[in-house]
From Swiss-Prot:
<dbReference type="InterPro" id="IPR023584">
    <property type="entry name" value="Ribosome_recyc_fac_dom"/>
</dbReference>
<protein>
    <recommendedName>
        <fullName>Ribosome-recycling factor</fullName>
    </recommendedName>
</protein>
<dbReference type="InterPro" id="IPR002661">
    <property type="entry name" value="Ribosome_recyc_fac"/>
</dbReference>
<dbReference type="GO" id="GO:0006415">
    <property type="term" value="P:translational termination"/>
</dbReference>
<dbReference type="GO" id="GO:0043023">
    <property type="term" value="F:ribosomal large subunit binding"/>
</dbReference>
<dbReference type="Pfam" id="PF01765">
    <property type="entry name" value="RRF"/>
</dbReference>
<keyword id="KW-0648">Protein biosynthesis</keyword>
<keyword id="KW-0963">Cytoplasm</keyword>
<dbReference type="GO" id="GO:0005737">
    <property type="term" value="C:cytoplasm"/>
</dbReference>
<comment type="function">
    <text>Responsible for the release of ribosomes from messenger RNA at the termination of protein biosynthesis. May increase the efficiency of translation by recycling ribosomes from one round of translation to another.</text>
</comment>
<comment type="similarity">
    <text>Belongs to the RRF family.</text>
</comment>
<dbReference type="InterPro" id="IPR036191">
    <property type="entry name" value="RRF_sf"/>
</dbReference>
Length: 185
């Protein structure tokens, strides 16, 4: 019984870390990556879809993204979506493709981004701790209902704590790597 609780907690912690990893990938650092456009949604064919569902995104050099729409009639819609996003990038289009030049970030903007990363990291730590709390409550309920012994309950809670420590450490490592990437000039 406790094995299922531990397995469920680990799955949920893994998902939390993966979501965090994707969120960090979408944060702008000093180089162009297609992940920058993950949150940009384009009005196309009567619905809003991610840019990468209607175009190919290439990185010809570290400071440029090239967006090649599969349907050229979407160029204006993609341009509008990028302008409406909070990326602070100015698209230029030549009728065939859209180019995004990634300007170097100011020191102030880098510091702001580091603060955002720290805030998101803390949110992920809290999410992981909440998963731990839920798992421990389920284990304690089993113990209270005499479904498992006190020793088994303690062992399971220790296992959940080890998982918590492991995933919080992983989140901290992701944060450190992203901060280093952001502060690179």
């Amino acid at each position: 019984m406790t094995k299922e609780i531990i397995k469920d907690a680990e799955e949920r912690m893994k998902k939390a870390v993966e979501v965090f990893r994707q969120e960090l990938a979408g944060m702008r650092a000093n180089r162009a990556t297609p992940a920058l456009l993950d949150k940009v949604r384009v009005e196309a064919y009567g619905s809003e879809v991610p840019v990468n569902n209607v175009a190919t995104i290439e990185v010809p050099d570290p400071r440029t993204l090239v967006i090649k729409p599969w349907d050229r009639s979407l160029i204006k819609a993609i341009e509008r979506a990028i302008n409406a996003s909070d990326l602070g990038l100015n698209p230029t289009n030549d009728g065939q493709v859209i180019r995004l030049s990634i300007p170097p970030m100011t020191e102030e903007r880098r510091r702001e981004l580091v603060k955002v990363v720290a805030k998101r990291t803390e949110e992920q730590r809290v999410a992981i701790r909440n998963i731990r709390r839920d798992a421990n409550e389920q284990i304690k309920k089993l113990e209270k209902d005499k479904a498992v012994s006190e020793d088994e309950s303690k062992r399971a809670q220790d296992e959940v704590q080890k998982l918590t420590d492991k995933y919080i450490k992983e989140v901290d490592q992701l944060m450190a790597a992203k901060e280093k990437e952001i502060m690179e000039v």
